Amino acid sequence: RKGQPRDLQPPGSYWEYNDVRVNLLSLCLLHTFKSPLPEVLKERIMGPIGASDTWEWMGYKNSFVEVDGRQMQSVPGGTHWGGGIHINTYDHARFGLLIHRDGMWNEQSILPEGWVRQLRAPSDIRPGYGFLWWLNTGGEEWPGTPENSYAAVGAGSNIIWIDPDNDLIVVARWMDQAAVAEFLAKVTQAV
């Protein structure tokens, strides 16, 4: 159905994976912080977790907006080919560890209390999806893995998979989407 027109539905009655809501969230965050989001990410998250200086978050050349008289690039929320975050595996894993630790790093709260709990909560209309994270609700997303596992999945199946039962963060890069469930089941069997 992607790219095909559909009738608008009442909020909470229809679910479709797309980048529209993420891009709107990015624009809202620009207006909230009044700073480019890559700067906010570096200052509030990547710096405190000790990420390298090699990551970058890129927008499109035609994605500038004015916020309080200042031109800022409205970073795409989704990972479109050519835009989004470019990050190494080490930094990916550190971010996963921050999420696994409920937003805490070195006994410092990096994310608002309760945020990670909310992102792991199944949505009513799509129980396998929380706040931008895929959930293994009922073991349906990745059979053979813990039902409380969850993952961030980006373009090219770049994955941060978190298994709270085994205190495990797995980062997989450029994996065939069809192979992800089997791969994660094998990881689970190995621990």
Regions found by a protein language model. Give the residues of each.
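Signature tryptophan residues that serve as conserved aromatic anchors
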Residues: 15, 105, 133-134
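Active-site-proximal alpha-helical segments within enzyme catalytic domains
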Residues: 21-28, 83-105, 158-175
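Short, gly/Ser/Thr-rich active-site loops of penicillin-recognizing serine hydrolases
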Residues: 180-191
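Bacterial peptidoglycan biogenesis and beta-lactam-recognition machinery
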Residues: 30-39, 46-54, 87-111
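Catalytic-site signature segments of enzymes, centered on catalytic residues
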Residues: 1-61
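Active-site Gly/Thr loop motif
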Residues: 53, 58, 63-79, 83, ...
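Short, glycine-/Ser/Thr-/acidic-enriched flexible segments
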Residues: 140, 176-177
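Generic alpha-helical structural context detector
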Residues: 94-97, 117, 121, 185
